[in-house]
Amino acid sequence: MDRRQCIQRVLAGERSERLPRALFGGGLWSYRQAGLLIEDIAKAPAVFAQGLANVFGDLNTDIIFTGSGLNSFPAETIGGKLSFRGEQAPLLLFPIIQKAADACYLTDLEIADSPYSLALIEMIAGLRKRLPDRYFCATSWGPFTWAMILCDWHLLQDKVVSDRKFVQEVCDLGVRLSLSLYEPLIDRGLIDGISIPDGAVTLIANDLYREVVIPYEKKLFDLVRARGAGCFLHQCGNIGQQISLYPETGADCITIDAGVSIGNAYRLYHERLVTAGNVDVINTIYGGDQKHLCTAVAESVAGISDPLYRYILMPSCDLPPDTPVNKVKEFLACADRIPS
């Protein structure tokens, strides 16, 4: 059984033969490891595919989050201008939605209008050929995080408290932007699942999240699952007050940040879905020594009542780009030192 099949079985609710493990994200980190500049992907997707294959081919990770760090690319389909910021994730030069009426006109989305998304798709195709045994999980923003990316901040702040219909419109636009990338990837058989980080929802009231945003997260997951892909939700930040709400999104796997008990999350989730996380990526993987790292992994897994059932060992969030590769390998190797 290869790594791809391992994760497929975990998501299907089957018991694992070994402890599943993966890096979450890792895009910006992997581009640095491969000596790649993000803005060059449109000119050389094959070079990116080979570079990332060299990086991930040397790592014992079951999942590759393809496109991690490049979540804003589909905004090109509605006129977004990308801002490349060195080793940081590209965002937009300016918000596309600067007044409420703007959201109504952004209806036609063609991935052909996004050169960077087209290049990303070709990069993923090349990576799939080189690493066919890994579970490929493509990333894009969650619906409300898209709203924060696309909207003038002062406009969104006002609408969050005064105009739920506007929030619904921009969340629906976010769903369509993500689908514009996911659908061609799924149609070509290039990915096994999708992942959306939607940590921006921790900045809004729980009732707004539950009543307005979750239906759009669920809409995206339902559409993708109908095409046979797995659905991952990553939530980071101050998630403690929302953690019981996340299963309502319909996700197959929820990957959680540090700051909450992985054991408590597993108890909430394990009868319905997979729990992943939440070894502290900053203080443990990036900043800790080998002994600290192994201890933290062992303590995290010890909080899981049945680590071989609906659980994946992961960091709490994305790797800092300058994380030493030996720390990453050590984290993944810890999975094989945990008694099964």
Regions picked out by a protein language model, each given a short descriptive name:
Residues 6-9, 47, 51-55:
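Residue-level detector of alpha-helical secondary structure
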Residues 40-50, 59:
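Short, structured active-site "lid" loops
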Residues 48, 73-75, 241, 263:
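Alpha-helix termini
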